[in-house]
């Protein structure tokens, strides 16, 4: 032991024969615990490696095989096969067999140890460049990393005495299992203590010498002089001592304290988080020398310790052999294994058994698909939590310190500025995201990974277009099972070129480059056409809200034969508006001598006027309103617009019960009794795509058919009004309905009513019938309740608070005082009280104009029901 250690400290090259003899001599001596320093084959020795600084380990290793010569330059064999270069690079005078034999007889005593590929999770991808330290197991002389030591012992020597190693409280990080299932490499390997021959480990805040009574060894362990090695009986349990830090050249051995026990280096803490194999952890090793001198400057110690303990518990469970797990049908595959006759205890995402086999397993508390979805969601959540937690200790383990992020100009997605001369956007020198991260693909905007998740890769090229991101769908399924992930840095993305020629093109989309700007207009026009087409398809079902403030005559295709007169009706609408746009609920037929007959419905003006304040032109409009609004107290609980006599402000609309009178076809002949506005409608109800129109039927046959609609079909299209109906009050009598009584158009329209119906002396009950025609002929989706004004000479509705369930579907006779004034012989209307549909107004209880209410009402409730 002393010969090997002395040789290593002095750095003298050892020849193969002498090494073999020394190895045989060492086999007879008890093997003490020694830290193994991995010597890369082609690395030059450094002064801080200890000794005199003239150690030529790589030269010694190659000298045992043959004289070393420089490899031939690949440029000398330009265009030829790589095999020629391999042959030319072989050592002179030796063929492959001799090389193999010499290496075999050189055995375990060579200075540079060959590692097999299975050990890559332990030793990393590039042992030539990675600095790490090894420990030797006293039982089997296996060389393992400190992180892998505990799992190695549990796997190999758990039958023998368990390690009586208590983690000292002064050291922060306990020894954690490496998650590699692979074996360690060959047992040999050179071991040398650090300069001064002392073993060091860093503790939480300062380097502490452990008290002698706390040394966790069962054998009588004598603390030796610091310069000497601590001797341990061979039969004792492994006591790995770990050389933690690369020694700074100026540091003396006297600064180092010694400790025994499985105190892992604090710098390796983050490496063992969910295990060495977590892909986002680059390597479990030491940072640059200046970062942790004297063991200080280690941030976030307690949290790291907690995380490492949790991860060790989790990984112990995962590393359990499948046969040792207790079967749970809710979390395990459960398919009976033919060999062991036991249920499979892999997770629900078991790749060994098919989906049908896993679905056929009995005893699960839920269906297999539900459990599988929950399992995948949990795995994703764990992954997210793990990546969040790894953002904290990013100063540790960062072998290539990244340059500070350059201030980046604000980047817009390429879709928002498609035709600007956009070169490939410079991406900040950020690092690729670890493979566990969800792929963030934001069009062609480059992504910066979170600043904490720094990985050991060199920065990405600055001119890399971010449109080449790769997505990682489907990786979350077997993350939990992939225990054998490599402990080496690798990128989750395809390698990117540092720069590439764009050949004068401009990138205007994801992977979309344009060479000629002459086609920009055509491309833009095509894009707009495609967008318009898609939007038109979308808005066929959801009509857009018009934001105009004047009645749009071009968007009101009238459905009667009296187009000129109805255009006159629109001009009267424009005359009556003061502040709010009237909304055409249906086409209105107006006779040439200002006799208004609401043939298909009514035109509601959203602006209530003061009593007697309207001129005869406005009275035409107000007559039309009064056709539907003068009966205030029908049993359907119509609510009115409360307005003072002189107020011109838009009033507060409240939803209430809508009227749905069931009229006979005799009542619906009001549509046709005007002399100049006989409607020649088709009698069919067709869907109207104009958002301003509520489709109405134009003949008495369709109105009677729609009046035969069941209340249930109405219910389907309505939203029940949750509030209490708004009480119609007496001050609301000064609304437009009053004007229609005082103006001449009322009597004129009464004349037409007598001509069409026969009973004389029809008073304001006539507008009820007109109103019922309108409601019946519309598709039972429009609630006119909030927009119906009440006349002054009519009493307050006595039925406004009748409960909804009593009135739905019940036919009630109107009281003479409530529905007919001056015409008690008129035919009583059968009214079924129905819920109002404009539930949208429950949100707009403020002072909003009636036009908005009407617009919302007509928009949200386009008719779709068929008789």
Swiss-Prot record:
This is Ataxin-7. Belongs to the ataxin-7 family. Keywords: Acetylation, Cytoplasm, Cytoskeleton, Isopeptide bond, Nucleus, Transcription, Transcription regulation, Ubl conjugation. Residues 472-481 have a biased composition (Acidic residues). Proteolytically cleaved by caspase-7 (CASP7). Sumoylation has no effect on subcellular location or interaction with components of the STAGA complex. Residues 320-387 form the SCA7 domain. InterPro entries: Ataxin-7-like_regulator, SCA7_dom. There is a cross-link at residue 243 (Glycyl lysine isopeptide (Lys-Gly) (interchain with G-Cter in SUMO2)). Residues 16-39, 619-647, 689-711 have a biased composition (Low complexity). GO terms for biological process: insulin-like growth factor receptor signaling pathway; negative regulation of insulin-like growth factor receptor signaling pathway; positive regulation of DNA-templated transcription; positive regulation of transcription by RNA polymerase II; regulation of DNA repair; regulation of RNA splicing; regulation of transcription by RNA polymerase II; transcription by RNA polymerase II. Acts as a component of the SAGA (aka STAGA) transcription coactivator-HAT complex. Mediates the interaction of SAGA complex with the CRX and is involved in CRX-dependent gene activation. Probably involved in tethering the deubiquitination module within the SAGA complex. Necessary for microtubule cytoskeleton stabilization. Involved in neurodegeneration. It comes from the Eukaryota. Residues 665-674, 846-860 have a biased composition (Polar residues). Its main location: nucleus. Pfam families: SCA7.
């Amino acid at each position: 032991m002393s010969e090997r250690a002395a040789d290593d400290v002095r750095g003298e090259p050892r020849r193969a024969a002498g090494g073999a003899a020394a190895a045989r001599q060492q086999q007879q001596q008890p093997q003490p615990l020694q830290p193994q320093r991995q010597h890369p084959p082609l690395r030059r020795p450094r002064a801080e490696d200890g000794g005199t600084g003239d150690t030529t380990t790589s030269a010694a290793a190659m000298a045992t095989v043959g004289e070393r010569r420089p490899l031939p330059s690949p440029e000398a064999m330009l265009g030829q096969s790589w095999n020629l270069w391999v042959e030319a690079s072989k050592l002179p005078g030796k063929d492959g067999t001799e090389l193999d034999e010499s290496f075999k007889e050189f055995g375990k005593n060579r200075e540079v140890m060959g590692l097999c590929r299975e050990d890559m999770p332990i030793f990393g991808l590039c042992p030539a460049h990675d600095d790490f330290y090894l420990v030797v197991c006293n039982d089997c002389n296996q060389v393992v990393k400190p992180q892998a030591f505990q799992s190695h012992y549990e796997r190999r020597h758990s039958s023998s005495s368990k390690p009586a190693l208590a983690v000292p409280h002064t050291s922060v990080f306990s020894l954690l299992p490496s998650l590699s299932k692979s074996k360690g490499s060959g047992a040999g390997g050179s071991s040398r203590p650090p300069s001064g021959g002392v073993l060091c480990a860093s503790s939480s805040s300062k380097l502490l010498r452990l008290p002698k009574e706390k040394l966790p060894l069962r054998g009588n362990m004598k603390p030796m002089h610091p310069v000497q090695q601590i001797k341990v009986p061979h039969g004792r349990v492994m006591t790995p001592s770990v050389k933690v830090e690369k020694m700074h050249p100026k540091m003396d051995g006297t600064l180092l304290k010694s400790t025994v026990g499985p105190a892992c280096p604090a710098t390796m803490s983050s490496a063992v988080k969910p295990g060495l194999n977590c892909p986002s952890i680059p390597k479990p090793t030491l940072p640059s020398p200046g970062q942790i001198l004297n063991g200080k400057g280690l941030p976030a110690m307690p949290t790291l310790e907690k995380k490492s303990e949790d991860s060790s518990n989790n990984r112990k469970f995962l590393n359990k052999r499948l046969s040792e797990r207790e079967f749970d049908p809710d979390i395990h595959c459960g398919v009976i294994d033919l060999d062991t006759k036991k249920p499979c205890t892999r997770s629900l995402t078991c790749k060994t058994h098919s989906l049908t086999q896993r679905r056929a397993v009995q005893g699960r508390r839920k269906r297999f698909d539900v459990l599988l979805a929950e399992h995948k969601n949990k795995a994703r959540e764990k992954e997210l939590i793990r990546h969040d937690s790894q953002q904290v200790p990013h100063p540790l383990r960062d072998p290539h310190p990244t340059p500070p992020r350059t201030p980046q100009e604000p980047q817009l997605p390429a879709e928002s500025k498609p035709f600007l001369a956009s070169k490939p956007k410079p991406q900040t020198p950020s690092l690729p995201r670890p493979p566990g991260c969800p792929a963030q693909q934001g069009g062609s905007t480059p992504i910066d990974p979170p600043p904490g998740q720094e990985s050991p890769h060199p920065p990405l090229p600055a001119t890399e277009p971010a449109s080449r991101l790769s997505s990682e769908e489907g990786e979350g399924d077997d993350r939990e099972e992939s225990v054998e992930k490599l402990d080496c840095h690798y990128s989750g993305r395809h390698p990117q070129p540092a720069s590439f020629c764009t050949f004068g093109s401009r990138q205007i989309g994801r992977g979309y480059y344009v060479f000629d700007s002459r086609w920009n207009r055509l491309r833009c026009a095509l894009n707009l056409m495609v967008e318009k087409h898609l939007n038109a398809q979308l808005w066929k079902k959801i009509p857009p809200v018009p934001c105009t403030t004047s009645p749009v005559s071009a968007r009101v295709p009238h459905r009667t034969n009296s187009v000129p007169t109805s255009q006159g009706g629109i001009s009267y609408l424009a005359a009556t508006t003061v502040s709010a746009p009237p909304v055409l609920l249906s086409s209105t037929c107006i006779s040439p001598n200002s006799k208004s007959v609401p043939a298909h419905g009514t035109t509601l003006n959203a602006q209530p006027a003061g009593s007697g304040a309207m001129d005869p032109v406005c009275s035409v409009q107000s007559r039309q309103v009064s056709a539907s609004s003068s009966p205030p107290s029908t049993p359907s609980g119509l609510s009115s617009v409360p307005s003072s006599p002189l107020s011109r402000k838009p009033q507060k609309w409240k939803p209430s019960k809508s009227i749905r009178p069931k009229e006979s076809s005799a009542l619906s002949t009001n549509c046709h009794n005007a002399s100049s506005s006989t409607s020649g409608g088709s009698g069919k109800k067709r869907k109207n795509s104009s958002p301003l129109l509520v489709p109405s039927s134009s003949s008495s046959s369709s109105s009677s058919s729609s009046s035969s609609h069941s209340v249930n079909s109405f219910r389907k299209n309505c939203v029940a009004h949750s509030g209490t109906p708004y009480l119609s009050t007496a001050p609301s009598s000064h609304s437009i309905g009053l004007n229609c009584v005082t103006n001449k158009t009322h009597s004129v329209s009464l004349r037409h009513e007598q001509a069409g119906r026969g009973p004389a002396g029809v008073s304001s009950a006539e507008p009820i019938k007109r109103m019922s025609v309108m409601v019946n002929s519309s598709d039972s989706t429009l609630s006119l309740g909030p927009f119906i004004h009440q006349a002054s000479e009519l009493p307050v509705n006595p039925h406004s608070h009748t409960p909804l369930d009593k009135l739905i579907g019940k036919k009630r006779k109107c009281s003479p005082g409530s529905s007919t004034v001056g015409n008690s012989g008129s035919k009583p209307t059968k009214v079924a009280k129905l819920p109002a549909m404009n539930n949208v107004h429950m949100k707009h209880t403020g002072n909003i104009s009636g036009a908005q209410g009407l617009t919302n009402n007509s928009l949200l409730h386009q008719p779709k029901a068929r008789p």
